[in-house]
Amino acid sequence: NTIITEQLSRVCMGIGLNIVAATFGCENLLYYGTEEQKKTYMPPVCAGDTVCAGAYTEPNAGTDVAGYKTRAVADGDDFVLTGNKMFITNGTVCDWMVVQAITDPEEKVHKSFSQFIVPADSPGIVRTKIKGKLGIRASDTAEIALDGVRVPKANLVGKRGAGFYQLMHFFDTTRVLVAAQGIGLSQACLDESVKYCKERTVFGKALGTYQITMQKLTEMWIRIEALRNMTYKAAVSLDSGKPDYHLSAMAKYFAGQTAVFCANLAVELHGGYGYIEEYKVQKWYRDAKILELYEGTKEAEVMTLGKVLMS
């Protein structure tokens, strides 16, 4: 998945994200779902027959996971969910979603959340496509409103009250694929810039023959190789069953920095041509910024790693 995501993101990071997001929510079922849940929901997703989503982020709480307000109240054999979710990938195209909601408000905040499988066509759900995004426009993003949505108690994923910790586990695994998006986009910026600098003539010489140009291209190359090695190492740790979540956080953090850095230099090297739609680098420039925002902001990654160092 890491290699495929990287390669697709070299052309369009939105498409690369669609590969990452194709199983959003399934990770929760894989780690914490019952055998019945896995047999019912996962095979159709793997076959490409259904689409899932992870409905976690809310209008007033993104990185602040403990600030989510959506409620799930037990009522007989059901839970009734009410709340709003924001910036949900696959939100308008999914067949079902895993929703994070408060079930036990009297408990400490980290033990108050649970997760539920919610069919997307359930009565009380309204899904609205978010338009006008800066980048990753090939990826579906939506706001989802839940108003008295009923799901059976059998749709509880994992343990009641363990939703916060289950969500943290989800982020730990998906950060590697976000880092892979950063590799692909950054590599595309470098490749396109090298090509342009060989062809573009400035003061009678190829742009790439100037030392300042070489410095910019070389710095891009060094950062990309460092990011690739860090990300691949984190991916190998996941595949081996011994995940290094600290390394995943580092890779995700560095991916955002590297992508923004490379995209910015790519536009600079292209000059005015980098600012028009005819050239690819303007798209990569717009796409890059999201890598510092979703699946945990760059500040959140620093805070996570900093706490490890200080513990």
Regions found by a protein language model. Give the residues of each.
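Alpha-helical interface subdomain recognition
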Residues: N1-V11, I15-V20, Y32-Q37, P44-D49, ...
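Short Gly/Pro-enriched turn/cap motifs at secondary-structure boundaries
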Residues: N18, V45, N60-T63, F87-N90, ...
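Flexible, glycine-rich active-site loops centered on histidine and acidic residues
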Residues: C26-Y32, G54, A66, E106
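A short, Trp-centered hydrophobic/proline-enriched beta-strand micro-motif
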Residues: G48-Y56, Q100
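Flexible, small-/acidic-enriched active-site or ligand-binding loops
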Residues: G67, D121-P152
